[in-house]
Amino acid sequence: MEMGRRIHLELRNRTPSDVKELVLDNSRSNEGKLEGLTDEFEELEFLSTINVGLTSIANLPKLNKLKKLELSDNRVSGGLEVLAEKCPNLTHLNLSGNKIKDLSTIEPLKKLENLKSLDLFNCEVTNLNDYRENVFKLLPQLTYLDGYDRDDKEAPDSDAEGYVEGLDDEEEDEDEEEYDEDAQVVEDEEDEDEEEEGEEEDVSGEEEEDEEGYNDGEVDDEEDEEELGEEERGQKRKREPEDEGEDDD
């Protein structure tokens, strides 16, 4: 799916200014560049573009409130100076799996004064001698590099993931509310169907009763006819002896 189309779907009838988290993982970028993102996403705090084929972030829009940026598994090899200009409040940056080969490539990150965590897993720069020591010297504002601090203490999960989980919880609550509303609509429709079926059964019952009544009426008529026939025959038998007596006279 193209990145522009993915952004449209992620909006879910919201305006860009309402969005705080945007996940575009595995979508397709146009010619290796970001597309569909504009300055209108002024409240955006978390952006994830994992494995979208990026080679450049030059057209990244102004995102003053962006705190966490996921760029892993792309083909970015430089141009990181744009981050300090467009995302001055960035605290977490993941460049794992990109084509970062030397320290000079990440030097522009010095201008990100609030940068607290940087990930460079599976980048060639990690193979350099004294890699960790040199990165911490180059970027003194960093607290965590590849998930560990200067003393090789692992970053707490709450620091790395807590912010995103908080956003996920909010979205889950919204989804649950939407689900509950949809479920209620379905229940109401089922109740209506049951009522209609009940009415149909009542009508069918009345029709059957009418038919039975009609049939009973036919039987009664037949019985009346039989009784009437017997009376006529009886009267005829009475008349016959009388007729015979008259003949004798």
Swiss-Prot record:
GO terms for molecular function: histone binding; RNA binding. GO terms for biological process: intracellular signal transduction; nucleocytoplasmic transport; regulation of apoptotic process. Phosphorylated on serine residues, at least in part by casein kinase 2/CK2. It is found in: Nucleus; Cytoplasm; Endoplasmic reticulum. Residues 150-174 are annotated as: Necessary for tumor-suppressive function. Residues 123-161 form the LRRCT domain. Coiled coil: none annotated. Residues 165-249 are annotated as: Interaction with E4F1. Keywords: Cytoplasm, Endoplasmic reticulum, Host-virus interaction, Leucine-rich repeat, Nucleus, Phosphoprotein, Repeat, Repressor, Transcription, Transcription regulation. Expressed in all tissues tested. Highly expressed in kidney and skeletal muscle, moderate levels of expression in brain, placenta and pancreas, and weakly expressed in lung. Found in all regions of the brain examined (amygdala, caudate nucleus, corpus callosum, hippocampus and thalamus), with highest levels in amygdala. The modification Phosphoserine is found at residues 17, 158, 204. Changing residue 204 to A: Complete loss of phosphorylation. Residues 157-230 have a biased composition (Acidic residues). It comes from the Eukaryota. Residues 147-156 have a biased composition (Basic and acidic residues). GO terms for cellular component: cytoplasm; endoplasmic reticulum; nucleoplasm; nucleus; perinuclear region of cytoplasm. Belongs to the ANP32 family. Component of the SET complex, composed of at least ANP32A, APEX1, HMGB2, NME1, SET and TREX1. Directly interacts with SET. Interacts with ATXN1/SCA1. Interacts with MAP1B. Interacts with ELAVL1. Part of the INHAT (inhibitor of histone acetyltransferases) complex. Interacts with E4F1. (Microbial infection) Interacts (via C-terminus) with influenza virus A protein PB2; this interaction promotes viral replication. Multifunctional protein that is involved in the regulation of many processes including tumor suppression, apoptosis, cell cycle progression or transcription. Promotes apoptosis by favouring the activation of caspase-9/CASP9 and allowing apoptosome formation. In addition, plays a role in the modulation of histone acetylation and transcription as part of the INHAT (inhibitor of histone acetyltransferases) complex. Inhibits the histone-acetyltranferase activity of EP300/CREBBP (CREB-binding protein) and EP300/CREBBP-associated factor by histone masking. This is Acidic leucine-rich nuclear phosphoprotein 32 family member A. It comes from Homo sapiens (Human). The gene is ANP32A.
